[in-house]
Amino acid sequence: MWKLPVVFIIENNNYAMGTSVKRTTNVEDMSEIGKSYHMPSFVVDGMSVESVHEAIEEASARARKGEGPTLLDIRTYRYKGHSMSDPAKYRSKEEVESYKDQDPIEQVKKMVLTKKILKQDDIDTIEEDFLIKYFLKQIIII
């Protein structure tokens, strides 16, 4: 891959559409793909905002310094099906609930409340503003 200043990100949510990654490839550790190109490759806890931020910062710094590409296998979870027509019946309720307990957005909310960085009213306002902007974009796109 020469010394291209690229950060390759695999958003690994455990499923390829409706099929478990374990059933679609013999390479469970996607970071091995980058290693086969002699590229620094790392598994990242995608359920941790801090871990994702740190990994992207380091990979970006490598790219900026001309040290070449990096591959990040960011392990996260998709709560819903692949599309509107996918009811996600291939997963158990227990599996989904176990990941919801680790939800990165909820973890950040807890942290900012615990450290008194924000109050619940602030979080509610941020969420409301986001939803308004999100739905306005959807209306404009249509």
What are these regions (language model features)?
Residues M1-I140:
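Glycine-rich ThDP/TPP pyrophosphate-binding loop and its adjacent helix/strand module
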